[in-house]
Amino acid sequence: MEALKRKIAEDGIVLSDQVLKVDSFLNHQIDPVLMQQIGREFARRFEKDEITKIVTIESSGIAPAVMAGLELGVPVIFARKRKSLTLTDDLLTASVYSFTKKTESQIAISGNHLSKDDRVLIIDDFLANGQAAEGLLSIVKQAGAAVCGIGIVIEKSFQPGRDELVKKGCRVESLARIQSLEDGKVTFVQEVRS
């Protein structure tokens, strides 16, 4: 997605050869126009998949997921990382390690919101090692629902997340694929269009 790549190139800050900071438009301050474009692009890529629910993880996945949900006309469910007084019954849970925060979290979704009849699109802001996506996959499978695909805003293709998900049979659609963050520079994967 060219608009996203431009935004990353202009406003993204390379903190190391492993970490890209995009808090000015994605995961702290949110650019709503860009989020709307992201939602439309996910909807376009998954429009034939008869999606019934979108699942994401709090908090940075919520904005792109809601915009995609708006475009597809389906509800969005986000997995909580923190315990909630109201989220107690029929929980679907998974353990997720955060590469950025270097912490492990127990994520949870109420089983009341997912069923075996659902066709789910998983959306997240970043794909690095694939831990968040794998946790969400586990939760969706616990519900008996079908995963139609995984939509990623920014993929760090130099890390193993995509390969791990593809090995599990997942369709992964990333809007911006980063080949490298070496020398303080963002280099995108050159994708061949058919």
From Swiss-Prot:
Catalytic function, reaction form: XMP + diphosphate = xanthine + 5-phospho-alpha-D-ribose 1-diphosphate
InterPro entries: PRibTrfase_dom, PRTase-like, Pur/Pyrimidine_PRTase, Xanthine_PRibTrfase
Record bears the keyword Glycosyltransferase: yes
GO molecular-function term, one example from the UniProt record: xanthine phosphoribosyltransferase activity
Residues the entry annotates as binding 5-phospho-alpha-D-ribose 1-diphosphate: 128-132
Location of this chain's protein in the cell: Cytoplasm
One Gene Ontology biological process: XMP salvage
Known EC number: 2.4.2.22
Pathway annotation from the record: Purine metabolism; XMP biosynthesis via salvage pathway; XMP from xanthine: step 1/1
Disulfide feature: none
Keywords: Cytoplasm, Glycosyltransferase, Purine salvage, Transferase
A GO CC annotation given for this chain: cytoplasm
Main localisation: cytoplasm
Amino acids binding xanthine: 20, 27, 156
Superkingdom, natural source: Bacteria
Pfam families: Pribosyltran (PF00156)
Subunit text: Homodimer.
PANTHER family: HYPOXANTHINE/GUANINE PHOSPHORIBOSYLTRANSFERASE, XANTHINE PHOSPHORIBOSYLTRANSFERASE
Reported function: Converts the preformed base xanthine, a product of nucleic acid breakdown, to xanthosine 5'-monophosphate (XMP), so it can be reused for RNA or DNA synthesis.
Family of the protein in this entry: Belongs to the purine/pyrimidine phosphoribosyltransferase family. Xpt subfamily.
Protein name as it appears in the record: Xanthine phosphoribosyltransferase
Lineage: Bacteria, Bacillati, Bacillota, Bacilli, Bacillales
